[in-house]
């Protein structure tokens, strides 16, 4: 039976460390601020925005919400981003995705100052991740690394398999594992021998958005299994991309859904915002 990797506990430690550093900066008169922009009234986006504001309050940051109507034009949003780029109170800018269809998401991401791009989506920061000279780490992959480290697993030389090649998780995840000297394989919808590849993984990270896709016969005995997926079943329950009940019997460590990777994403967003404030004030 696998050991459970408790994302709530690990994320609480990350946030507590951020809170202590933020308090030390506040004592020097340095306030930290995160601007969160939401366009339209997507219920899921509203939940995410509220959780980010709550996390800011927990760690002692100021949060600034900008709620724009669904019909906002691309130029109007670009104008707001420009204002926030120049705002000294704002250390991080987060534009909640998805955006309405009339707005080009890439144009907005590219307009955010790389120094305030705490999601690490800007091409400049993506390039920095590629060469291993990063200030900001993409929040979900960075959170996954913290969870792997919490198990005491040494990534060096391990067979690491990432299922999924998205720009947000799969690609940067593979880079972070590679920078730690993992032997990395990326699998995707066109991979022909997926089962055989996964069964060799010492560390398996799954991020494809397909409920219970990874079954026990795809998992190596004693593997570390990180489930990034979040799917809602017909009965309303949440589940990941891994068949938890079956894989748990075979894995060495496994993340639950919910309560695994999810809490880490917001914790790492707080860490990136702190990093931005420290960089701005010449502390790193």
Residue ranges of model-derived segments:
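Positively charged, low-complexity intrinsically disordered leader regions
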Residues: 1-30
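Anion-binding alpha/beta catalytic cores of soluble intermediary-metabolism enzymes, centered on
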Residues: 94-155
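Short beta-strand elements in bilobed, periplasmic/extracellular small-molecule ligand-binding domains
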Residues: 34, 56-70, 184-186
């Amino acid at each position: 039976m696998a050991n459970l990797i408790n994302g709530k506990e690990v994320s609480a430690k990350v946030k507590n460390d951020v809170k202590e550093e933020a308090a030390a900066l506040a004592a020097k008169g340095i306030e930290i601020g995160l601007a969160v922009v939401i366009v339209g009234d997507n219920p899921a986006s509203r939940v995410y925005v509220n959780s980010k504001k709550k996390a800011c309050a927990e760690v002692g940051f100021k949060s600034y919400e900008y709620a724009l109507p669904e019909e906002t034009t691309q130029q109007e949003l670009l104008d707001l981003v420009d204002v926030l780029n120049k705002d000294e109170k704002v250390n991080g800018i987060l534009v909640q995705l998805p955006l309405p269809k009339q707005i080009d998401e890439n144009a907005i991401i590219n307009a955010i100052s790389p120094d305030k791009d705490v999601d690490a989506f800007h091409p400049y920061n993506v390039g920095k991740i590629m060469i291993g000279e990063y200030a900001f780490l993409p929040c979900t992959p960075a959170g996954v690394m913290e969870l792997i480290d919490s198990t005491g697993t040494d990534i060096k030389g391990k067979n690491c398999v990432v299922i999924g090649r998205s720009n947000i998780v799969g690609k940067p995840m593979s880079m972070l594992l590679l920078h730690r000297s993992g032997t990395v394989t990326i699998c995707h919808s066109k991979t022909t021998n997926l089962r055989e590849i996964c069964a060799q993984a010492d560390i398996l990270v799954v991020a494809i958005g397909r409920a219970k896709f990874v079954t026990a016969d795809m998992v190596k005995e004693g593997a570390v299994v990180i489930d990034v997926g979040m799917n809602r079943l017909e009965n309303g329950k949440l589940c990941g991309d891994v068949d938890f009940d079956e894989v748990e019997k075979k894995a060495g460590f496994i993340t639950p859904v919910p309560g695994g990777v999810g809490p880490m994403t917001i914790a790492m967003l707080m860490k990136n915002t702190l990093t931005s404030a420290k960089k701005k004030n010449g502390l790193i």
